[in-house]
Regions:
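A conditional alpha-helix N-cap/helix-loop micro-motif detector
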Residues: 37, 104-107, 138
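Secondary-structure boundary/capping positions in well-ordered alpha/beta enzyme cores
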Residues: 39, 74-75, 99, 121, ...
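Glycine-rich helix-loop-beta junction characteristic of Rossmann-like nucleotide cofactor-binding loops
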Residues: 44-48
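Catalytic core of membrane glycerolipid acyltransferases/transacylases, capturing the structured
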Residues: 34, 49-105, 113
Length: 240
């Protein structure tokens, strides 16, 4: 059963996550990912157990939302491309906490749904880069997530994801997540200047952790192996 854009947002605002469905999918996905690649997560205590919170991860892969969701105890809501909600799977995605966003312009329906989720005291994950970044390194963080957090009085939790870059299954290395120090928004106003200030405190944590992990020797070898150069790198190391 397909739904219209308006119906999708109404479901997301009024019904939210289906607890039993969310748990079934979460634990099934966790089992599959552990078999295929493995994953670790640190700093989960930085995500409040209740109350509104905006999680701001970097975005390298379609699978990033799944990894964030399976390591946290509380359900997490995500925006997804509107095209994913055009078919019969739309009700399923909506009850898992996803909701549509139309790209290319400010989508007021999606923004209002995000506000409703935070007013309800739920967790919302937004990718500040706006889309998947396929190039090396990270993209520039936009202010929208911080502005929503300020409006809701919700802390920003910077989150670093490594191991999903340009990979197909099976992943050559484990996926690793680090939930950083929350950035409080008390005393800030929902202005472009204050939103820039808030994301400017959160995003450097992601950049620094991502750069630190990418610089590890084992990560360099794994990345080279993924493009067929691993044997050459390892051979050179053995000769030293």
């Amino acid at each position: 059963m397909s739904v219209t854009n308006a119906e999708a947002h109404q479901i997301a605002r009024e019904k939210g996550v289906s607890g039993p469905l969310y748990l079934i999918v979460k634990y099934t996905a966790a089992l599959v990912f552990r078999i295929l690649c493995g994953f670790t997560a640190s700093g989960k205590e930085n995500v409040p157990a209740k109350g509104p919170v905006v999680i701001v991860p970097n975005h390298k892969s379609f699978w990033d939302p799944f990894f964030v969701a399976i390591v946290l105890r509380r359900p997490v809501h995500f925006m997804g491309k509107a095209e994913h909600f055009d078919g019969p799977m739309a009700p399923f995605f909506l009850r898992l906490g996803a909701f549509p966003v139309r790209r290319g312009a400010s989508d007021e329906e999606a923004l209002e749904t995000a506000r409703a989720i935070l007013r309800r005291g739920d967790a919302l994950a937004l990718f500040p880069e706006g889309t998947r970044v396929r190039e090396e390194g990270l993209g520039t963080a936009k202010r929208g997530a911080a502005r929503l957090a300020i409006e809701a009085g919700a802390p920003l939790v910077p989150t670093t994801i490594t191991g999903t870059e340009k990979r197909r299954w099976p992943l050559p290395r484990k996926v690793r997540m680090v939930f950083g120090t929350p950035v409080p928004v008390e005393g800030l106003e929902a202005t472009p200047e204050d939103a820039a200030l808030a994301i400017g405190q959160a995003w450097p944590q992601v950049e620094q952790e991502y750069a630190r992990w990418q610089a590890r020797p084992g990560v360099i070898v794994a990345g080279a192996a993924a493009i067929g150069l691993g044997a050459l790198v390892v051979s050179k190391r053995r000769k030293k």
